[in-house]
Design a protein with these regions (language model features):
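Hydrophobic transmembrane alpha-helices and their immediate junctions
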Residues: 7, 332-375, 407-409
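Membrane-embedded alpha-helical segments of multi-pass membrane proteins
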Residues: 34-52, 93-105, 154-165, 201-208, ...
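Aromatic-anchored transmembrane helix interface
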Residues: 36-45, 61-80, 84-109, 120-129, ...
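Transmembrane alpha-helices of multi-pass inner-membrane enzymes
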Residues: 166, 345-346, 366-422
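A membrane-periplasm/extracellular boundary helix in multi-pass inner-membrane enzymes
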Residues: 193, 211-265, 288, 432-433
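Long extracytoplasmic/lumenal interhelical loops at the membrane interface
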Residues: 265-288, 292-334
Length: 434
């Protein structure tokens, strides 16, 4: 009996996913716990070492990108040394570049070892997220929280549920199995119930991209037998689970209508208007430093965002500016260069892969659709720590190392013949030829 040990290759990606609050909540009640912060720094340092260890497995574009990132870190350290007489005056700003390093570590590791058993990883995430909801955030599952718009489960953890939904949907389309389809619908239902409207929009975009990618995915069966349960199962679950009764609740309907209105009017109501006010507070500084941003001086800038009711600063000075948009965060600290530094190479590599005639596999399609949705997610939130590793993993599995050609067949020469040939001097062979 042969036991596969490929599950050990999940460790790198699994450790990164464990940094999400849904999992850290089992150990740390406070997200600002200094021990948790130290663990995150140690993980980042380990990822830097891992990226250097597997550098030889990088493709040429990825290797170039890696050295550009190191050059940017060196330039930032030099700026700190010249202006503040220390090599790392504000770690908060340096971390915005260091957090990208897990992308290279995960890319190099999985380009070296190939696709791990993703089914085991996704099952772990599924059980872990469900357990965290029930144990650590039970208030998020109550109907009262839904009506009052109390989001117990944070947006980063909810966004991770979308990756699960994409994976199990593609597995169902490729291999069938009603349990996979059921997990997909339950995941979508939880995304809707947890009320993070940004994730709602990301789910619509990701599913659209995923369906387009499935058209050129190998092993996918787009048949009537596959699609029929997609329409029947939600109806059965809705009737059997009492969802129709819940939707008849006027408070629930009012909450859904309010959420849809917030999506339709992001500049006038809801958290969208709050983000717009934050952006306008910093817009002059972004426009004043459009190319490379304010960098270290940006951290010294006092908080510019004030609450509309109390006219007080939303956060304390010296704690960062807490941007609720990845784009605004990058533009403020590093300008247009900061945005392009992260996005240009992945977009280029994805486009090059999609232009290649070789079909995708179901896993690659799911991860690429998830990456596409991150471009929309970035308008509303900063990237979670695991997002960079997801980028690295997706780039690795869609561009694996080329398989070496098998060695040419050499017929086996009998030992007696070899001894005879070795016994004949080369000079004798030459005289014989003459």
């Amino acid at each position: 009996m042969i036991i596969s040990l490929r599950f050990r290759f999940l460790v790198v990606l699994l450790v990164v996913f464990l940094t999400d609050q849904a999992f850290t909540a089992f150990v740390f009640e406070d997200t600002d716990d200094p021990v948790l912060w130290m663990c995150m720094q140690l993980l980042t340092a380990s990822m830097i070492g891992l990226s250097a260890l597997y550098l030889r497995y990088f493709s040429r574009p990825m290797r170039t990108w890696y050295f550009v990132m190191l050059a940017c870190l060196a330039a930032l350290a030099l700026e700190s040394r010249i202006g503040w007489d220390t090599w790392m005056v504000y770690p908060h700003v340096f971390n915005k570049l260091l957090v990208i390093m897990p992308l290279f570590a995960v890319y190099g590791f999985y380009r070296r070892y190939g696709m791990p058993p993703l089914g085991l990883l996704m099952a772990f995430l599924l059980v872990g997220l469900a357990a965290s909801l029930v144990i650590n955030f039970p208030e998020a599952l109550s109907l009262a929280s839904f009506v009052d718009n109390e989001r117990g489960f944070n947006v980063e953890s909810t966004y991770l549920i979308l990756l699960l939904a994409l994976y199990y949907f593609n597995q169902y389309v490729a291999k069938g199995g009603l349990p996979r389809l059921l997990v997909f619908f339950v995941a979508l239902g939880m995304i809707g119930f947890l009320q993070h409207r940004t994730v709602w929009l990301c789910a619509v975009l990701a599913l659209t991209l995923n369906i387009l990618l499935l058209r050129r995915t190998a092993g996918v069966t787009l048949s009537f037998q596959r699609f029929l349960p997609m329409f029947v199962l939600p109806i059965v679950v809705a009737l059997g689970g009492g969802i129709g009764v819940v939707l008849n609740n006027p408070e629930v309907v009012a909450r859904l209508e309010t959420s849809l209105e917030d999506i339709q009017n992001p500049d006038k109501q809801g958290t969208g208007s709050w983000r717009l006010q934050q952006f306008r507070s910093y817009e002059p500084f972004i426009l004043e430093h459009p190319v490379a941003g304010m960098r270290l001086k940006g951290f010294e800038l006092p908080i510019q965002f004030y609450a509309t009711d109390s006219k007080l600063k939303v956060w304390k000075d010296g704690t960062g500016h807490h941007f609720h948009s990845w784009y605004v965060d990058r533009l403020f600290y590093f300008g247009v260069v900061g945005v392009l530094l992260v996005l240009v190479m992945p977009i280029r590599l994805v486009i090059r892969r999609l232009r290649h005639p070789e079909p995708l596999d179901a896993n690659s399609a799911a991860f690429l659709a998830f990456l596409g949705s991150s471009l929309l997610y970035s308008f509303s939130y900063d990237w979670p720590y695991y997002m960079y590793s997801v980028y690295g993993f997706a780039l690795a599995i869609m561009d694996p190392l080329p398989v070496a050609a098998p060695a040419a067949y050499q017929p086996r020469v009998p030992r007696r013949v070899r001894r005879t040939e070795e016994a004949i001097p080369s000079t004798a062979v030459a005289h014989a030829d003459a």
